[in-house]
């Protein structure tokens, strides 16, 4: 169905600012709609600026594009995963000052700590893709701050306490903390 500005909050441009989709992510997503070969180019040129893409009018679809928020979110995860932690900190902190005061307060306490948290598993071959928009950051970092950590020891699904104990006992035998 078509998006409705009354029924669908994502029909308003302000929605994307409030959710914290980075401008870079929106640009990447729009380019996937505009040129059919952009995604192939991006796979081959992961760190190249979008401006280096050889845009070709002949590669534009003749039919109108359909908006896909799931695709935007996926593109955004990829874009953010390639950002240095310092940039993720700066952009998410600036966003939080306006839209999520609790995150802004946590980050203001210790910027170096916040940047270090955001750098966890960011610089390897396969950086983590947990953050799709800045509104995801508080949940992502919450376990690192006493003010936001909520312990949860409930087992999910069909797991029993006996199974959990067995998994931990077996895991202890093979885990290498030096990895």
Show the residue positions of the predicted features.
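Catalytic adenosine-cofactor/nucleotide-binding cores of aminoacyl-tRNA synthetases and other
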Residues: 1-165, 169
